[in-house]
């Protein structure tokens, strides 16, 4: 219930968030794709989170790298692109297809893939922007390690239904953080 309430609070941010003030031109449909992806993740839920309490785990979301106030615009887009790529990797794995409704999973992956294409195009527009390579690499590494922990967790739990439910909720949180970061960067400009 708490996650549903949090989701409903994020929807207005998604609806009004301008996408063209980040130093690149994200299409106007990008925020709609974010909204649809988050909605699909909610619909994908197969188990009550209460039934999986024993399986919960803190994956150590790198909030200081993805959601921190000090993250720079030029650094944000590559980091968000990496985060989106990692989400796609998890949900397009062979083990993922057995865990979810095929129609919802395909729709979710299509939305995430389109977001990734938007972000990659944005990264290409920023090629001339110089950001401290060490800072950016540190953030990218933090995102990769975070998703590695999620992948290891799924393997250790043998891709159980509860493990997938925990991961679904965690990915919802990660995508919500990315939405909030983009909204914050848009407001700063």
From Swiss-Prot:
Protein name: Interferon alpha-5
Cited PROSITE patterns: INTERFERON_A_B_D
Chief location: secreted
Membrane-spanning segments: none
Assigned protein family: Belongs to the alpha/beta interferon family.
Alphabetical UniProt keywords: Antiviral defense, Cytokine, Disulfide bond, Glycoprotein, Secreted, Signal
Cysteines engaged in disulfide bonds, as pairs: 24-122, 52-162
GO molecular function, one term: cytokine receptor binding
Entry annotated with the keyword Disulfide bond: yes
Keyword check for Glycoprotein: yes
Lineage: Eukaryota, Metazoa, Chordata, Craniata, Vertebrata
GO cellular component: extracellular space
InterPro entries: 4_helix_cytokine-like_core, Interferon_alpha/beta/delta
Pfam families tied to this protein: Interferon
């Amino acid at each position: 219930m708490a996650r549903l309430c949090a989701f409903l609070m994020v929807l207005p941010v998604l609806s009004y968030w301008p996408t063209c003030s980040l130093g690149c031109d994200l299409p106007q449909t990008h925020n709609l794709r974010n909204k649809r992806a988050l909605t699909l993740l909610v619909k994908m839920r197969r188990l009550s989170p209460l039934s999986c309490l024993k399986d919960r785990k803190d994956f150590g979301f790198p909030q200081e790298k993805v959601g921190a106030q000090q993250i720079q615009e030029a650094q944000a887009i590559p980091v968000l692109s990496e985060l989106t790529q990692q989400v796609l990797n998890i949900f397009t794995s062979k083990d993922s297809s057995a865990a979810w409704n095929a129609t919802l999973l395909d729709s979710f992956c299509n939305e995430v893939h389109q977001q990734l294409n938007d972000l990659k195009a944005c990264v290409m527009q920023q090629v001339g922007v110089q950001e401290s390579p060490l800072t950016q690499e540190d953030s990218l590494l933090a995102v990769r390690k975070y998703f590695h922990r999620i992948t290891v967790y799924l393997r250790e739990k043998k891709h159980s239904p509860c493990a997938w439910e925990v991961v679904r909720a965690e990915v919802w949180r990660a995508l919500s953080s990315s939405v909030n970061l983009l909204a914050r960067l848009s407001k700063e400009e």
